[in-house]
Amino acid sequence: MTDHTPALQRPATRTARLSAIEQALLTRIVTSQSQLSQILADQGIEVTQATLSRDLDEIHATKTRLADGTVAYAVGKQNIDEHPASNPDAKTEQQISRVLSGLVTSVAAARNLVVVHTPSGAAQYVASVIDKQPIEGVLGTIAGDDTVMVICSEDDVAKRRAQWLLDVASKA
């Protein structure tokens, strides 16, 4: 499957660098700081080993042994077999399903957008959950009080993501 997500343009800030590091650890199996440094360099982010080490500490990244014995960096609390890059679709769906099953009241695609309605006050939480997951073709979200707009890279991606969100939200 080809990733239709355009490369993100990131400002040269510490916050953007931390975000790029976290996203790399969520979407790939990263086994060394030099590998992570190269991933960041490919995105136009130059970082020293000392800075990278401090950044990994700051985002609470840890080295975890995966089921196949590989030692890789991970962020957040993850079980030994559950590095997100090992099975991104199942892991993403499971995490999102827990939240969306009780909070999504309707979903619709409109061009390259997916409009998600929630109960009053829940939209920002739903958007945050979507933003934290590596979902192919999703560029980001905007949330109000009871509505989330999911911005997709293309119209057909929005249609697929709308159906996927509806399916995931329907699981109880």
From Swiss-Prot:
Gene3D superfamilies per the UniProt record, alphabetical: 3.30.1360.40, Winged helix-like DNA-binding domain superfamily/Winged helix DNA-binding domain
Biological process according to GO: L-arginine biosynthetic process; protein complex oligomerization; regulation of arginine biosynthetic process
Location in or out of the cell: Cytoplasm
GO molecular function, one term: arginine binding
Purpose of the protein: Regulates arginine biosynthesis genes.
Pathway field: Amino-acid biosynthesis; L-arginine biosynthesis [regulation]
Encoding gene per record: argR
Family: Belongs to the ArgR family.
Keyword set includes Transcription: yes
Keywords linked to the UniProt accession: Amino-acid biosynthesis, Arginine biosynthesis, Cytoplasm, DNA-binding, Repressor, Transcription, Transcription regulation
Protein name: Arginine repressor
GO cellular component, one term: cytoplasm
